[in-house]
Amino acid sequence: DSITKEQKEWVIAYFKHHVIKHINPVIIDTDTDLVSFLKDEFTYLLVNMTDGEEVHHALIEIPTDKLPRFIRMPSEDNTVTFMFLDDVIRVGMNKIFYGLFNYTKIEAYSIKMNRDAEYDLLGNIDRSVLENMSEALKQRLNAMPVRFSYDAQMPEHMVNFMARELKMSSIDSMMAGNRYHHFKDLLSFPSLG
């Protein structure tokens, strides 16, 4: 939030030249099956666009498989400044949705969903443990969500919207968390040397 005008211009240019080609927003409507769409352990931005009573939602997968999670920004002094890829996308959101929807307010919050990871590695005694593990991993791709993590700053109406869309029950875990998810990406933090 505290970047200079020059840095913001650089971020918008970076977004246009490097990021937007990897963004495939999913517009959420009554036909969207988020349970099937969301990938286990991936971080997304849930976008909320409002214009008076009219509300639209979309999901953006953070493309960390194509781009670094941490973007080094130029600075005029000797300081080193990084920005999360999530925030680069937030800065460029109008470039994605302008013209698709009329909105006076646009906001985005991080979310992550985990699927049921219960494995029965010895379930079929006619198969090896490796074959059973392979089958269990395939089942996990289609398993129901059991945990939904979201930015604690996300408005309650958006949390409730996602709980409905993901068909979360009272026994499933919904956890308010930090603005950023998937901290294993810190392992790929660029060297400062």
Listing of model-derived features with the role each one plays in the protein:
Residues D1-G193:
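N-terminal non-catalytic structural scaffold regions of very large proteins
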